[in-house]
């Protein structure tokens, strides 16, 4: 079995993110509204007769073996399909790593879509999402993306009113934030503020993007330390540049702002790009039909 195809792997944003509590399996129950944007990696998948799944990437510091989630996704797919062919994955990365933008998860989801196209195995979107859940918590969402309410550890997906196409500026400071450490900090708090998830869904239903932007909220921002104070500074600069709202995505360290018009977004991006190498002007996109 041979063949090659290329799939885009879109970044995801968390319009809201709530941690409901720790689970007995080591994960946490989450509730979040997620949104895809056009910033993407390119994932080229080639079938061959080597019997080996491996990857290569334009980022030398990323793993290319079984530690790479895209490779794990290929292994899960082949096992489920009963196939023994080899898979070569070429990842052209644009999405920042350690940013809370789901780059690895989206790459894994793109591999699942590509393998379904190449093999014609006949898996449904739901089955691809189930495979994705074996690889990572965000992978099921990334299979089709769009505007979704995600619950459980991220695998329970409910469609909400799609967000219209809007300009977005993403800025990642030059430091990572430890995901396990953030969860530990949240778990240690006896009380916490909660995002208005219902309010965000209602704003989407009403098409009221300023109201949605004002309600964007990420509980992880409450447990950032002074060392991570640059997150708040970037948010302020986005808001000063005209963003309707700004918030950290996932466990960071990327921050994004939603804008009403492209000119304001471009201006804000230019200002931030003077100080940050990883700064992107992109836009929201809809859900894939699979």
What does each model-identified segment do?
Residues 144, 149-245, 260-290:
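Conserved, helical-rich catalytic subdomain that frames metal- and/or nucleotide-binding sites
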Residues 32-34, 129, 139, 155-161:
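A generic local secondary-structure boundary/capping motif
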Residues 49-63, 111, 206-216:
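Short, basic/glycine-rich phosphate-binding loops at helix/coil junctions
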Residues 1-99, 117-126, 163, 170-175:
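ATP-binding N-lobe of GHMP and related small-molecule kinases
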Residues 90-119, 137, 244-259:
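Glycine/serine-rich anion-binding loops at beta->alpha junctions
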Residues 86, 108, 112-149:
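Contiguous, small/hydrophobic- and glycine-enriched helical/loop subdomains that border
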Residues 15, 43-45, 70, 104, ...:
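Residue-level signal for inorganic ion chemistry
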């Amino acid at each position: 079995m041979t063949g090659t195809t290329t799939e885009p792997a879109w970044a995801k944003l968390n319009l809201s993110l709530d941690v409901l509590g720790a689970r007995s399996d080591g994960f946490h129950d989450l509730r979040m509204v997620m949104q895809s944007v056009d910033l993407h990696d390119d994932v080229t998948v080639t079938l061959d007769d080597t019997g080996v799944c491996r990857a290569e990437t334009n980022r030398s510091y990323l793993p290319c073996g079984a530690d790479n989630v895209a490779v794990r996704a290929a292994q899960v797919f082949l096992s489920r399909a009963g196939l023994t062919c080899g898979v070569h994955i070429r990842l052209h990365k644009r999405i920042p790593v350690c940013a809370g933008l789901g780059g690895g998860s989206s790459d894994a989801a793109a591999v699942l879509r590509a393998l379904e196209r190449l093999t014609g195995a006949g898996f449904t979107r739901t089955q691809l999402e189930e495979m994705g859940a074996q690889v990572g918590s965000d992978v099921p969402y990334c299979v089709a993306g769009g505007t979704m309410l995600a619950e459980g550890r991220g695998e329970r997906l409910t469609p909400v009113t799609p967000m219209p196409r809007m300009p977005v500026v993403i800025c990642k400071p030059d430091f990572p934030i430890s995901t396990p450490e953030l969860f530990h900090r949240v778990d240690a708090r006896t009380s916490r503020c909660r995002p208005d998830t219902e309010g965000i869904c209602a704003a989407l239903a009403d098409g009221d993007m300023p109201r949605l932007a004002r309600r964007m909220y990420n509980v992880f921002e409450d447990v950032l330390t002074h060392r991570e104070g640059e997150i708040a500074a970037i948010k302020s600069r986005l808001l000063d540049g005209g963003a309707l709202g700004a918030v950290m995505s996932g466990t960071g360290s990327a921050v994004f702002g939603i804008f009403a018009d492209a000119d304001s977004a471009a201006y804000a991006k230019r200002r931030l790009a003077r100080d940050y190498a990883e700064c992107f002007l992109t836009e929201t996109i809809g859900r894939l039909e699979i």
